[in-house]
Amino acid sequence: MSMFCYQCQEAAGGRGCTVKGVCGKTEDIAKTQDLIIYVVKGIAIYSSQAREIGLNTSEADKFIVESLFSTITNANFDAKALNARVQEGLKVRQSLKDAIIKAGGSYNSKENKSWTSKFLSVLGIKNDKDEKEIHDAAVWAANNPEDFKKKAETVGVLATENEDIRSLRELLTYGLKGMAAYLEHANNLGYDEDSIHAFMEKALVATLDDTLSADELTALVLECGKYGVDVMALLDKANTSTYGNPEITKVNIGVRNNPGILISGHDLKDMEELLKQTEGTGVDVYTHSEMLPANYYPAFKKYKHFVGNYGNAWWKQNEEFEAFNGPILMTTNCIVTPKASYKDRMYTTGVTGFEGVKHINASKDGKKDFSEIIEHAKRCSSPKEIEKGEIIGGFAHNQVLALAPQVVDAVKTGAIKRFFVMAGCDGRMKSRNYYTDFAKALPKDTVILTAGCAKYKYNKLDLGDINGIPRVLDAGQCNDSYSLAVIALKLKEVFELEDINELPISYNIAWYEQKAVIVLLALLHLGVKNIHLGPTLPAFLSPNVAKILVENFGIGTISSVDEDIKMFMN
């Protein structure tokens, strides 16, 4: 069977990639990622049971989160690392199984008979009260990449034959991938929430359950949105407690004459470590793409060698990384297949990877040694200037709520007629120029609320302000879509409305990968309706599942700029 992947917006032909991913991943990489997901589901069978009886599941929790994150679009293209993850997963699964069996031996008193029956059932051990055959995901075994390859042929997306069940399972899985990304960042800062892990494991197990109906899976998808809100709130707490609340900031987009390191991705802990280790070395630090919002945090402003932001959204990195001249650190997705001209200057860390690119691992205490990349930078020329000037951002919920009286007054007086949430992702497709044209064409009495790399379609346009309020309010990274939800809920309270959809807020969101999926599900959980997704609807939504979202939540897509603005403003 050839590869099949349709998890991102750029799925070939709007249906799915079957020869090679548009993202650049090979058939072998795609299938190994399928197998990682299958291994994770097997681990979840045991970890959910272990959690129920009070066993420590921290090792499994960590592995599940990191593994889901490693399969997000544009995160990891390193076959060796991915195969090693499969091998490690089988060991984690076996360790959990052994712990449950050991615990069962000491919990077989009369009052624990029902529990004993239950855990024996989970293990596939027959007993007179409860017989259950354990799922293959919990028992299959292999020892080498060739055997992994054979197994991967049988466990891909298309292994689920029913189109609607497949669609719901994948929608749930992609939501979990986005959730895992946000949870990983919170964990790196020492923040965690057991209920989120418990839901992730429950949901993973549910994707293996052939007895679940479409209605039951739909309910789980919506429940995923609830935990999406929880995980974004957790990450918001982790980021702001550690680095302070983002504040209005003018960010330099020019360059200086010192050698520099360009840091891309989302991990603020990596950002902190890099700034600390480069201080006093003569090496400057620049953010790229989704790391731009690091400029808004007070804790990072004390570093004089933190220059600003270089370049634009992830998909332009081939040209921009070449022009930067210095080394690049990829902390998370999005990686584009690197050009030979800068591949030897590229470094990955965390769950990211690319074959032939140097990887920086964390030590046992979680620390990372960036000395190699710093020494590399010293041997490089300073960055080539590709633009100059400043952009403004830092409008997360704390900052916007501090401006609440000004904002509320502008709404009440009619100075601001409508807000447009244009959060989400940027991408390569030319049809995404729609979002630039849309921003330009919006009436002057409207304000754009944004988060994520979608902002690069319009954050350098001169759209002016309304009574001192910029017409583009950038909350931060894609996870900071949480801030936009908090702002909306506060406005609902201030205006004493019963329904969040009564607010003068429209949602025109550009999506690309799986973090956008969890943001969408979170918004649905909060009751937001009539969200428009573009530039196309997800390929993984079957006609029937898409119909459910349209009929129950008013989900739509985009048409032309003029038609859409007319529709939104009426």
Curated annotation (Swiss-Prot):
Gene3D superfamilies: 1.20.1270.20, 3.40.50.2030. Its EC number is 1.7.99.1. It catalyses: A + NH4(+) + H2O = hydroxylamine + AH2 + H(+). Pfam families: Prismane. The keyword Iron-sulfur applies. The modification Cysteine persulfide is found at residue 425. [4Fe-4S] cluster binds at residues 5, 8, 17, 23. Belongs to the HCP family. This is Hydroxylamine reductase. It comes from Clostridium botulinum (strain Langeland / NCTC 10281 / Type F).
